[in-house]
Structure formats: C-alpha cells, structure tokens
A protein has these predicted regions:
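N-terminal beta1-alpha1 cap of cysteine-dependent amidohydrolase-like domains
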Residues: 1-115, 125-133, 137-146
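Conserved G/P- and acidic residue-centered "switch" motifs that form tight phosphate/ATP-binding loops
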Residues: 118
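The feature captures the ABC ATPase H-loop/switch
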Residues: 121
C-alpha cells in the first residue's frame, strides 16, 4: 500500500452562539461548512473557538493549511472599519471579530490560503482595510440582495 499524504488541515473559525436553554455560550460552525471542507475539499476541518485572547496568531496560522471563513448571523462590527455604530437591535459577535480579523491578516502574511463565504467575505474585506455597508439593502441605489 503506498504512503498517503496527510490531509490538509483547514481552520474554520467558530461563531459564539447563545442557546436559550443554556446559560453558557457555545462556539460552533454550521455542519454544511464543516462537510464542505471534509467531503468537498477532502481536508481535515478544525473548528477554531472564538477565543482571541488565548491565541498566538502567527503560531496558529503556521499550523493550518487553509482558512475557511463561514457565514454567520452577525455582521462585522463597524468600529473595525470606522463605520457608523450599529443600531441597538443588531446581532453582534465581538469574540469572532477579534479572533478572525487578526488571524486573516496573519494567514495572508504567511501565504496560507483564505476562503470566505458571506460574512467570511466581509471579514476578509475588513481585515485587509476595506469598509462595509452592513445593511446594503438600505443604501440608496442598491437592491435588496437577501
């Protein structure tokens, strides 16, 4: 039997989730994203909890072969790109923001491939210096994209 190369390790940053029946926050990612990495990319998915203060980002980036940035319920908070404040009813995920944005920059610096879907594309944009309209459907001249 020939030697097999190890599967690439693809990091999937988690969103912080609050479930009504639990008093503690959960960290998770949608199964469709995990299966896309596992089955579609034939890679080993690794969910990265949103715990920014606990990571050495250069070390973390050096341990993964790719970074898959998923969609999520929350938008990137506007203070990361000097945008106007969110309204009070906007869903937030500051732990994900604080984990993902520096990790993206480090992956780009180290040449680790980065892929984004939905919110993940917003994260790449903001991490690399871009701005957002977090409610683009409310901007004059834009169609409702939802």
């Amino acid at each position: 039997m020939p030697d097999r190369l190890p599967k690439p390790l693809v990091g999937i940053p988690a969103s912080q989730i609050f479930l009504p029946s639990h008093s503690l926050a959960q960290h998770g990612s949608g199964e469709r994203y995990i299966r896309a990495v596992s089955d579609g990319a034939v890679a080993l998915p690794m969910v990265i909890p949103a715990l920014a203060d606990h990571y050495d980002f250069p070390d973390l980036a050096s341990r993964i072969d790719g970074l898959m940035l998923t969609g999520g319920r929350a938008n990137v908070e506007p203070h990361h790109y000097d945008g106007p404040p969110f309204p009070d009813d906007e869903i937030r995920d500051p732990l994900r923001d604080n984990t993902v944005l520096p990790l993206i920059r480090e992956c780009v610096e180290q040449g680790v491939p980065v892929f984004g879907s939905c919110r993940g594309i917003q994260e790449i944009n903001v991490a690399l210096g871009g701005t957002l309209f977090y409610r683009v459907h409310e901007q004059p001249g834009f169609n409702d994209h939802r």
